[in-house]
Amino acid sequence: MLGFAPAPGRPLFVLFGSSIVQFSFSNGGWGAALADIYARKADILLRGYIGWNSRRALQVIDKIFPKDSPVQPSLVIVYFGGNDSVAAHSSGLGPHVPLEEYIDNMRKIADHLKSLSEKTRVIFLSCPPLNEETLRKSTSTVLSEIVRTNETCRLYSEACVSLCKEMDLKVVDLWNAMQKRDDWATACFTDGLHLSEEGSKIVVEEILRILKEAEWDPCLHWKAMPTEFGEDSPYDLVSSSGQSTVNPSDWTFHRTIQWD
């Protein structure tokens, strides 16, 4: 049993998924950006597992998200589907999960997460597109041939979005969000599959948009959340007048992107 132990009174956000989640704290990734945006507002916990599919996630979801944990997450952001969509290997091994089973697995994952508490909110991320040519060149020779195509990514992405509409879940449609950029194929990936800093910016923007627009109580958008120990203090920096202090708790000058 893993369980969670955030700072007292601070909400917990869990990022759960495959390599796009595991790598999200590297190279300007979207997880690292969220951790910065929510500094002193929420604890961002990484539960990313490279190579995983929805079948493997479902097998251990009770261990990763135990229902008897004394602390339950306020938000879980979930990504599975890219590995599920890989073509089936002739050996029967590998990450491929048939589309109908993928849909059923994601439904069960959503049901489990929604049952954790009345305040646990869920956002799914759908499959992004690929740069197939770059991916073919970057795939390690230690692996058997891996067949990933944009056509199957599209099918699994559309299935995820449709499921979320059916279940009244929030979803980031990465398939379409990425392709709003004319240069998405070259700008949004490091290896044709995993997200670059530019690709991660799109993920962050879409997540923040959902959190801002969602009619959730309490609101989980960063601007609506209190800053931990954000009260004025005589120990803050002294103002130019020399007669008072300036509270820096919510300063964001260090960010190259001023997120909405």
Swiss-Prot record:
InterPro entries: Iah1-like, SGNH_hydro, SGNH_hydro_sf. Highly expressed in panicles. Expressed in shoots, mature flowers and seeds. CDD domains: Isoamyl_acetate_hydrolase_like. This is GDSL esterase/lipase WDL1. Glycans are attached at N83, N150. Keywords: Endoplasmic reticulum, Glycoprotein, Hydrolase, Signal. Its EC number is 3.1.1.-. The lineage of its organism: Eukaryota, Viridiplantae, Streptophyta, Embryophyta, Tracheophyta. GO terms for cellular component: endoplasmic reticulum. Belongs to the 'GDSL' lipolytic enzyme family. Residues 1-35 form the signal peptide. It comes from the Eukaryota. The keyword Hydrolase applies. The gene is WDL1. Involved in the organization of leaf cuticle and wax crystals. GO terms for molecular function: hydrolase activity. The active site is at S18, D191, H194. The keyword Glycoprotein applies. It is found in: Endoplasmic reticulum. Induction: Down-regulated by wounding, drought stress, salt stress and treatment with abscicid acid (ABA).
